Amino acid sequence: MDSGWARGRFGVARVARLATVDDLGRPHLVPIVFAVDGSVIHSAVDAKPKSSRALRRLANISENPQVSLLVDYYDEDWTQLWWARADGRARVDDDGRTAISALARRYPQYREAPPDGPFIAITVERWSGWSAADG
């Protein structure tokens, strides 16, 4: 798949899986909501219940900024299956003005209760994907 197709799948997906790696090489995978803004994908630590605000994903990004995001579509009709991935470098950002704006355009919940962060900004270095329809 070309990068434009993969990037387009991120425009229709509502949730992604963020993959980070800790300093010992152990993977960590969590679902996130996100917004694409050019070549940057934004996400936020928001008010949804969490055991702590000191999240493993934030520590992992500080230790190793290389991350992957995966979106996918499943259907019982396997000719409809697809997945798309964005690989890039993430950074934790406390000033989330750009992220809040992008996320609020995509998710009505953030218009009512904007996240207070911290925020994650991922500069995408590679878009890739697969679709059963295209083999």
Language model feature labels by segment:
Residues 55:
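Structured soluble/peripheral alpha/beta segments that form catalytic or ligand/cofactor-binding pockets
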Residues 13-50, 69-71:
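Short beta-strand segments
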Residues 64-67:
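Short coil-to-beta transition motif at edge beta-strands of beta-rich domains
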Residues 1-17:
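Short, basic/aromatic recognition patches
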Residues 11-13, 26-27, 83, 113-115:
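Short solvent-exposed loop/turn micro-motifs enriched in small/polar/acidic residues
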Residues 1, 52, 73-135:
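Charged, gly/pro-rich active-site loop segments
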